Every structure is written in C-alpha cells, then in structure tokens.
Swiss-Prot record:
GO terms for molecular function: ATP binding; serine-tRNA ligase activity. Consists of two distinct domains, a catalytic core and a N-terminal extension that is involved in tRNA binding. Gene3D superfamilies: Bira Bifunctional Protein, Domain 2 (3.30.930.10), Serine-tRNA synthetase, tRNA binding domain (1.10.287.40). One of its GO terms (cellular component) is cytoplasm. The gene is serS. It comes from Leptospira borgpetersenii serovar Hardjo-bovis (strain JB197). HAMAP family: Ser_tRNA_synth_type1. It holds the Pfam family Seryl_tRNA_N. InterPro entries: aa-tRNA-synt_IIb, aa-tRNA-synth_II, aa-tRNA-synth_II/BPL/LPL, Ser-tRNA-ligase_type_1, Ser-tRNA-synth_1_N, SerRS_1_N_sf, SerRS_core, tRNA-bd_arm. Its main location: cytoplasm. This is Serine--tRNA ligase. Belongs to the class-II aminoacyl-tRNA synthetase family. Type-1 seryl-tRNA synthetase subfamily. SUPFAM superfamilies: Class II aaRS and biotin synthetases, tRNA-binding arm.
Length: 417
C-alpha cells in the first residue's frame, strides 16, 4: 500500500517501478490518480456544504429566538443535509475503490535493487565458507535421512498426502535441537525477544503484511471460522503492533518466534518433489524488527548478519544474493537471500530471505510511533528467516555425511541432544 501523495507526485516514476517488477496493469496508476482527484473535489464540495449548513443552522436559531417563521429555512437545511449524505456516499464508494486498487500495488524498489526479469538475474554479493569435497558421490538429504531411519516420507504421505514427512528418533531430536539453538542465539546474542504466537490469524492480519488480497489462493484458509493458517511467523509477529502507536523510546523492537508454517505450494508443481525443500508444513524461526525510518537500512544489515551467524556457527557454506526487480516479492523494497550449499543436490538453495519493507506494511496495518515532537509517524518493518529449520536440517545431512552413511552433528548442536 503506497502513500497517496507519492502516487500523485511521482506517477511516471511509479509506472517505471511497476514495469521493472513485471506488473502488467501499469495503466491502473492513471485510474488511481483520477480517483484521488475526484475524492479531493468531492471532499471540497462536502466541506463547503457543511460550512453552509452550519451558517444556516445558526440563522435558524436566531430566527427561532426572535419568534420568526423557520419553515422555509428549515427546508433549506434539510436539502443541504440530503446533498451532504449523497456526496458522502460517493466519497465512500471512491474510497473503497481506491483502497482495493492500492492494496494490489507492489512496494517501491530500493535504488540498490538490480534490474532483472527472474531469479537468473539475481546478483551474488559474496560467499562464505569452503564448499566441501567428497571422495564419494554425495547423496541427497532424503536418501540419507531414510537410510538412517531419521525421516519417513511414506508415513507422512499416508497421514497428509504429497509433500509430507515424519521425523524419528535422532532425526526428531535434530529438528528440536535446531529450533532451540536458533532461538537461543537470537535471544541471548542478538537481543531479540521471544514470542509465542498463534498458528491461525484473521484476514486483517494477512492483509496488513501483504499476503491478502492479492495472494489469497496461495495459503490455507479455514472458511467456517474465517481464519488462516500462517505461511510464516512474519504475519502474527508484525501484527502484534497493528493499529497501535509505539513510543519512540521503545524502538527498535526486535522479536522472534518459532512456528509451523503452512503453504499450498500451488505454483511449484514438479519442483523439488522429494525431500524437505518444498513441503506444505515446515518449521521456521522468524525475525521481525520495527524501527524508525532513518534506522531501517542499518537494522536490515544487522538482521542479515544475525541470520548469517546461524550458518557460520553450524559451519555451513553459503552465499548472499540480492534479488532483482523481477524476482523480489511484491511487498519488499529490498531483499537479500541467503543460499546454503547442498552437495547432494549440487546447487545452492535458499535458506533465508531478509527483507526491508520500509513503511509498506506499516501503512496497511497502521503501525505508527509517536516521535518526541508528538507527531505520529509510520514505522519501518523488517523481517527474515532465522532460519528455515527443515532446509537447515537438509543442509546438515548433505554437508556432514561420510562414505558409510553417518552424519556428523555440528559441534554447537551436541549439547541439545
């Protein structure tokens, strides 16, 4: 959701941004600008009528006080009132159309975002860690997990259908160890406050963070109760402060949560059909920050380093890329992806996205802070995975396997077993 003043004053620049993002309905900006202008004209008209009604109402009072006949002037007041209601109805209709269009617009891109059409145009920023070499052909994580009896995909499919799995024995312990390890690092070393949040949220929450209305078909919804299974803890964590005004001295606020995440993966038919990479339910530790606009770039960098620190402690090789204009999410202004090396799959795989939304989500969710001069301003929101646990699990199996099928648990996790 964009600032209306920005839309009217930067129409051509906004169209260019939409084109870079691959947004096809660029002409909608001209329509939006026309609606904004009509709203302003209607508002001026209704303000003048209210002013007229106030003057006439005072005159009615004066005539009544002097004992005069108010029949004619009262009829005039009634007509003005009816005209005001008529224009207010038009105003409401225009406002609803404006909001619906604005909710479908993507965020403004940061100048640092490279131009591009797809994931192939993303730009590598740097690589960390040495890619391991093996004296044998490394196996993919799903083969390793099944051989160790740590992962049972067959029973997952039996329970829930495709893209499901179950963990067993030390395999289940590894999942729990990763969750506790990540939360401990983020709370004890990085200064985040741990929060437990629901796995079901209302439509207002999904709208504030940008999942609704545009991407409604991508998520699981419980129609009877008008609730939605969360695709990420970003949704409940960000909405903790929806419709609230935060005192300036409380910023920045940094929160983290471990949750299950649920995604339909409707557009991924045929992609990563085996293993833990693309499933309908997975575990993730999420990071969310609320900060002042002038601090958001620095806080974004900090969050990226926090997500990277988990991989450094686990000694997993990875790289950081910046997403191009055609691959970045509609809600984000700038996003860095962290991709971990997967020897068994012989490729890098996304394990975290760290995004700065600027005031995009805050405007949708009315998340503000009161500055020292008493003014209410929109915060900036930042979020990232810290990390996706299933993919981290898969990376450990592939990077720390040996020739006889054993997996060596990273040193930092051993105390959690």
């Amino acid at each position: 959701m964009l600032d209306l003043h920005y839309i009217t004053e930067n129409t051509e620049d906004l169209k260019k941004v939409l084109e870079l993002r691959g947004f096809k309905e660029v002409g909608i900006i001209d329509e939006l600008k026309s609606i904004i202008q009509r709203k302003r004209e209607l508002q001026r008209e209704v303000d003048l009528l209210r002013e007229e009604r106030n003057k006439v109402s005072k005159e009615v009072g004066r005539i009544k006080q002097s004992g005069g006949d108010i029949t004619e002037i009262s009829a005039s007041v009634k007509l003005v009132g009816e005209k005001i209601k008529e224009i207010e109805t038009k105003l409401e209709q225009e406002e609803n159309v404006l909001i619906n269009i604005n909710l479908g617009l993507p965020n403004i891109l940061d100048p640092k975002v490279p131009n591009g059409k797809s994931e192939y145009d993303n730009v590598v920023q740097y690589e960390v860690g040495k890619i391991p070499s093996f004296s044998f052909p490394p196996k993919p994580h799903f083969e390793i997990g099944e051989a160790l009896n740590w992962i049972n995909f067959e029973k997952g499919v039996k329970l829930s259908g495709a893209r499901a799995y179950t963990y067993w024995k030390d395999g289940a312990k590894l999942e729990r160890a990763l969750m506790n390890f990540m939360l401990d690092v983020h709370t004890k070393e990085h200064g985040y406050t741990e929060v437990w949040v629901p796995s079901m949220v209302n439509d207002e929450s999904m709208t504030a963070t940008g999942q609704y209305p545009k991407f409604k078909d991508e998520f699981y919804r419980i129609e009877k109760d008008e609730l939605n299974l969360i695709p990420t803890a970003e949704v409940p964590l960000t909405n903790l402060y929806r419709d609230e005004i935060i005192p300036e001295d409380q910023l920045p606020i940094s929160v983290t949560a471990h949750t299950s995440c649920f995604r339909r993966e409707a557009g991924s038919y045929g992609k990563d059909t085996r293993g833990l990479v693309r499933v309908h339910q997975f575990q993730k530790v999420e990071l969310v920050k609320f900060c002042k606009p002038e601090d958001s770039e620095e806080e974004h960098k900090k969050m990226l380093s926090h997500a990277e620190n988990i991989l450094k402690k686990l000694k997993l090789p990875y790289r950081v890329i910046i997403l191009c204009s055609g691959d970045i999410s509609a809600n984000s202004s700038i996003t860095y992806d962290i991709e971990v090396w997967m020897p068994g799959l012989n490729r890098f795989m996304e394990i975290s996205s760290v995004s700065n939304f600027r005031d995009f989500q805050a405007r949708r969710g009315k998340i503000r802070y009161k500055s020292k001069d008493g003014k209410n301003q929109l915060v900036h929101t930042i979020n990232g995975s810290g990390l996706a646990i299933g993919r981290t699990y898969a990376a450990i199996l592939e990077n720390f396997q040996d020739a006889n099928g054993t997996v060596h648990i990273p040193e930092v996790l051993k105390s959690y077993f």
